[in-house]
Amino acid sequence: RSTLFPYTTLFRSYDFDTSVDRSGTYSLKWEEAGDALPMWVADMEFQTAPQIRAALQQRLDHGIFGYSIVPPAWNQAYVDWWHRRHNLDIDPESLVFSTGVVPAISSMVRKLTTANENVLIQTPVYNIFFNSIINNGCRVLESPLKYDGSGHYSINWADLESKLADPQTTLMILCNPHNPVGRIWDRDTLARIGELCWNHHVTVISDEIHCDLTDPGYDYVPFASVNEQCAMNSVTCMAPTKTFNIAGLNTAAVMIPNPVLRHKVWRALNTDEVAEPNAFAMTATLAAFNESEPWLEELRAYLAGNKAEARAMINEYNAAAAPERRIALIESHATYLLWVDCSKLTHDTALLCEHLKRNHQVMFSEGAEYGGNGHDFIRINVACPRSIMQEGFNRLFAGLHDFSAE
């Protein structure tokens, strides 16, 4: 069977088809999977851009790995990237370095709230948000997204407003674009969220780490770009790590236009000791944003091809499967993570994922981790060579065929 990919690049400069052996590299993704094919945690099976590898090699060859500063060139790299790619003009002074988006979020939950206050999240959503809230003495307040049963999520505005209006709710963590459902929030939606949070005195943390991994032809809207209210009442978390597959290098930024809020966040990150770069963080960030854009464009096209192939394979499977064993792929235009509805088969995908890993040697993320109606879903990472993705889906289909929820 051949598939025509809508975003196939006929003459690629970069290789995304060759499998790279990650054994011996202490990879979380592979070590946790054991003998299973790992299609769970969100890192990619591609070497990072050669421009980044060359810069890191040069830094490595220097041989001295002492303490690092954050140079003005780091701020400027973010400013130039967001202006060029996302039409957002960032004040360099509004950027603060952090060792990661998650450490920054956890630190801000501690500093911007008092104990037992509510932090609102829109579920199903990135599971580590729950950890950042609970581990820092606050309460998770879920405003579940509405699911129409046929592949589309939307915001329950009445529920969102009632929960933001609770005086105990002081912080909202927004996922933009949204992981795991892959939704790119449009400007009107973000404006309405911003207005509600402003009216009810709720600060917004916008996690925008997936912003550069949109399908070709689709652009995300930075929360801070929507209007002055959104800008002055928010902290935006941004990083090159998801985009360029360098999560292990621990480099990120928070962008805070409001100087009063910025000082609080700066104090939080420094108090928690997550504001100093390691010896490779600056080198990797500068090479990513200043030199690696062509690699990213080819990556996005390749990922879009993978997603198109995944949809074609699911359609082919469904055409031959019994109705009670069919699955549905959620429509999405961001991230390399697919959110797959398995509710016809089971309402406990933890059991399904266990079966798939044990009996068919493929590992996905069980949806219940993400809250909301996630128990009906699995999350599949397709950032891998197409042949590996195809093998993973064939194992999935075999597992769906012989799964029993009893």
Q: Predicted regions span which residues?
A:
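Single conserved hydrophobic/aromatic residue that forms the stacking wall/gate
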Residues: 1-9
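N-terminal small-domain helix-loop-helix segment of the aminotransferase-like
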Residues: 8, 12-100, 107, 288-291, ...
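Conserved core segment of the aminotransferase class I/II
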Residues: 54, 228-304, 400
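Conserved core of the PLP fold type I
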Residues: 65-195, 212-213, 220-225, 229, ...
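Helix C-cap/helix->beta junction micro-motif
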Residues: 136, 199-200, 230, 360
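PLP-dependent enzyme catalytic core of the Aspartate aminotransferase-like
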Residues: 230, 346, 354-364, 370-406
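Conserved glycine-rich beta-strand-loop-beta hairpin in the small C-terminal domain of fold type I
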Residues: 286, 302-311, 329-342, 374
